[in-house]
A protein has these predicted regions:
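ATP-dependent adenylate-handling active sites, centered on carboxylate activation for C-N bond formation
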Residues: 1, 5-21, 129-132, 140, ...
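Cysteine-centered catalytic environments shared across enzyme families
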Residues: 2-261, 271-315
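Short, intrinsically disordered low-complexity segments
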Residues: 25-26, 441, 524, 531
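Acidic, low-complexity intrinsically disordered regions
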Residues: 44, 406, 435, 442, ...
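Structural motif
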Residues: 108, 112, 171-175, 425-436, ...
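Acidic, carboxylate-rich catalytic segments that either coordinate divalent cations
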Residues: 355, 526-534
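Core structural elements
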Residues: 437-449
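Short amphipathic alpha-helical segments embedded in low-complexity Lys/Glu-rich regions
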Residues: 507-509
Length: 534
């Protein structure tokens, strides 16, 4: 079925039946210089509102939140949510004021203030018609942009713009997504492309500037990060990281009523739980399993909660699609809203529908942003990564490309363009290239796709999705981060009972025949490759 036909099918059903209209492009936004006159029709259906921002029109879906403050010729906009664990401000109107004040000092001060903020958000500043847009630390909130028929579009959902403008999917993207190799990997597109040639993706640590035309500029890093060598230094900053994560969790407890922390037995999750010490009565705790492999994690989480005296809820997600009303249609809605390249598995869709229908929480605290600091690639491939990675490494990290050498070369070309455009073709200051690759490519490309699909249910946040906190993590020695020593020291400092539960869940992703094949493919495809980027 072609994308065009699927759009028509969705429109036909939603025109007749309003029940699922709120699921289409849920929590979406669209900034454009074109006034839209049909907000009662597909794809808006009367549940999007219009806000005038300088000379632009901002359209917001009913489940999304937006905050706007104007001072003189400056307008600050936060789409989504944000909070500051450094000064404990958690009302976005106050944060908009702070951003305007910082911008008045200078661009460096402005982005330093941006880097203090935790949450899932897109931040825009409009200065006499000029737009400066950036995202949360790991760019988990989508920001796609383009100029079509001399009109600008900045949005969470490329497919929304495609529907409005009649765009056609790029044949190369279609070939990649439909290939057998695509799902053997992270299910995202190479570089900063989208399914449509007219639109591109903004990513972590960069900002979008619009001043008659679009360009991407880097604002982080601007200097070396600290290097914690002495035990005194390490102890001091273990305490600081724990305090800042705790502060962010405290901000969440103040911002929302029905707060929950989703748990597994993994390192990131346990670190968040330990840092919530002193706030445990403000949260509920849950795990789920939508396939048998997830049950081990869920049972580990329950054991930790038992050791802390916390009530834990385990949700058993039904394993049959037939248990959910209109499953096939909701699957099509999700496929459309996630731009046809996320390729969600049925068990994931069942989980999302279950949580949507449950509607039990205002905010869920997740933890996986801190993976940025855990030397993922070396732990997975069990080899020392080169100091400088290239476009081929990025392609193979993304998709295994078994039997598709033509697609592999095409992917390399997209990454060459991306790395040059973002200034990531070589290490920046004393940051390890692999760390920035994971932060800006794995998290930026894959993470934003995951969050986009999870917008179907309650709102999520990540107390560790903060640029300054991640920088502190990265300031610890490589081997200590790789062994999870840093996370374990934070747990021990914040709540030793989390460690005393003795729950250690092995990462099944790092074992088995599949990973052996991936290691072999990585070595074969990178060993003799000569980079074309320099």
């Amino acid at each position: 079925m072609s994308i065009k036909i699927l759009k028509d099918e969705i429109k036909s059903e939603l025109d007749k039946n309003p029940k699922y209209r709120e699921m289409l492009f849920r929590r979406g936004y669209l900034l454009t210089d074109k006034k839209l006159n049909s907000l009662d029709e597909y794809p808006f259906y009367g549940i999007w509102s219009e806000i005038r921002v300088d000379k632009y029109f901002l359209y917001i879906q009913q489940e999304q939140t937006v905050y706007k403050n104007t001072t003189g010729n400056l307008t600050s906009v936060i789409i989504g949510h944000a909070y500051n664990p450094f000064d404990m401000k958690y009302r976005e109107d106050d944060l908009c004021d702070d951003l305007i004040s910082a911008y008045a000092i200078g661009k460096e001060a402005y982005f330093d203030k941006v880097s203090e903020l935790t949450g899932l958000h897109v931040i825009m500043l409009i200065d006499n018609g000029k737009i400066i847009a950036c995202q949360d630390a790991c760019s988990l909130t989508g920001c796609y942009f383009g100029k079509i028929n001399n009109r600008i579009y900045i949005t969470e959902h490329p497919q929304l713009v495609a529907d409005l403008c009649g765009l056609t999917i790029d044949s190369k993207v279609e070939k990649l997504v439909e290939s057998k190799c695509y799902n053997i990997g992270n299910r995202h597109l190479p570089g900063n492309i989208t399914p449509y040639k007219e639109l591109k993706r903004l990513g972590a640590n960069t900002y979008l500037l619009y001043d008659n035309s679009f360009c991407i500029k880097r604002f982080y890093p601007i200097c070396n990060h600290p290097e914690f060598i002495t035990e005194n230094d390490k102890n001091k900053h273990i305490e600081e990281i724990g305090r800042l994560i705790h502060n962010g969790i405290d901000c969440c407890a103040k911002k929302w009523n029905r707060c929950t922390i989703s748990l597994s037995g993994g390192t990131d999750s346990k670190t968040t739980l330990a840092c919530a010490n002193g706030l445990y009565d403000k949260f509920s705790y849950f795990s789920f399993h939508s396939k048998p492999q997830e049950l081990v994690d869920a049972e580990g989480a329950k054991k930790i909660c038992d050791n802390l005296g916390l009530e834990h809820t385990l949700y058993h997600i039904p394993e049959e699609n037939s248990r959910f009303d209109d499953f096939d249609f909701i699957k099509k809605l999700l496929q459309h809203s996630t731009n046809y390249f996320v390729n969600l598995a049925d068990n994931e869709i069942r989980k999302y529908i279950f949580l949507h229908d449950l509607s039990a929480y205002d905010i869920e605290l997740k933890s996986w942003a801190s993976e940025v600091a855990r030397v993922f690639f070396e732990r997975k491939y069990e080899i020392k990564m080169p100091k400088i990675l290239n476009e081929r490494c990025a392609s193979v990290f993304q998709t295994r490309f078994f039997g598709h050498p033509g697609l592999l070369k095409w992917s390399d070309k997209q990454y060459i363009d991306f790395l040059r455009e973002t200034g990531l073709e070589k290490p920046l200051y004393n940051y390890e290239h692999t760390d920035l690759f994971y932060w800006e490519i794995r998290m930026g490309c894959w993470g934003v796709s995951v969050i986009s699909s999870q917008q179907l249910y309650h709102r999520m946040t990540m107390p560790m999705n903060n640029r300054k906190i991640l920088e502190l993590f990265l300031s610890f020695p490589h081997d200590e981060r790789k062994s999870d020593s840093v996370h374990k020291r934070i747990m021990a400092h914040m709540n030793k009972k989390v460690i005393d539960a003795e729950v250690e869940i092995p990462n099944l992703y790092f074992h088995g025949y599949r990973i052996w094949m991936e290691k072999l493919f990585f070595k074969f495809r990178t060993m003799f490759y000569r980079s074309k980027i320099i």
